[in-house]
């Protein structure tokens, strides 16, 4: 009987030891998923002791899902996770970051963490006054160009994370950075199919900086303002016809009808002349086909990089035959720039589609939003 008691005691003791080991290595049963209303390109699951971030299709036709383990410093010190199971293990909150697109900067600023940005490729393209101040005081280093980032400077900065973007995943610089031990995450906001889906990527940065609640609150306000503006525009009965884009060499590029840009025009309640088209990427049309369809368009928006009627006419005299040219009804965002020439729309437009939509409503339905001053768009210079 005594031997049986000792045997049970030993089994119980060994079981307790094994249980302790299991508790340190197995995932927690508690889990909550980050709520995303529009974005499809990423997901976050919080297991209490750690988070799993997944990036899906960060560029067109991408077939790989990238998986990242997010741990606090305290959790990282006792972690027994296998690094080979993840594309990277990242310690949060991020204290030093490098981002590679101006579209990433507004999220940092809105979350109040712009001071964590230590390097950027192409600092002249940055328009944000706060971030320009950090650049001017040498707190943010110049890293060259996105496809040829100065890895020597970047490795010297030793950021906790590099947030990149890619069109096909074949970026040798990012591979070099990863091999040095610095994690790289591809941001796929630009692949999303709606303006609000793109804007919701602020929640991606919210997770990285332990500011989930703040990111959620900011996005909710952007969403509300966007939907309120859309509802206001829906009440009008007169819809101006709209042309977009311009020629590049022998091809006229303009948004297809299922693009985020076309969605903005739809929500502004205008007659976008190519709203019925579908497909991925931009439409690529001949001048003749566009002229035939859009010669009498009431408005011409975003005529490529042209900033004035003179520049547009010099590029192609045939542009002058459009009614929108004759009536001086052409609007562009390229004339709204930062101190060093960066186009504000390219930087902020993704995060603030509410402002883009209000700009379009102000232009297309001037009787609405009477006290609103367009943020990005201006009439083409005469």
Which stretches of residues belong to each language-model region?
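Solvent-exposed, polar/charged alpha-helical surfaces in well-ordered, non-transmembrane soluble domains
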Residues: 95, 105-109, 152-156, 175, ...
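Flexible, glycine-rich surface segments
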Residues: 229-316
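A short, structured surface patch at a secondary-structure boundary
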Residues: 60-155, 161-166
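Extracytoplasmic substrate-binding proteins
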Residues: 139, 160-163, 170-251, 275-276, ...
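Structural recognition of the beta-strand scaffold that forms the well-ordered cores
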Residues: 96-99, 116-120, 161-165, 184-187, ...
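Bacterial Sec-dependent N-terminal signal peptides
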Residues: 1-22
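A short, gly/pro- and small-residue-rich
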Residues: 114-117, 176-188, 312-331
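Bacterial Sec-exported substrate-binding components of ABC uptake systems
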Residues: 16-105, 214-243, 309, 326, ...
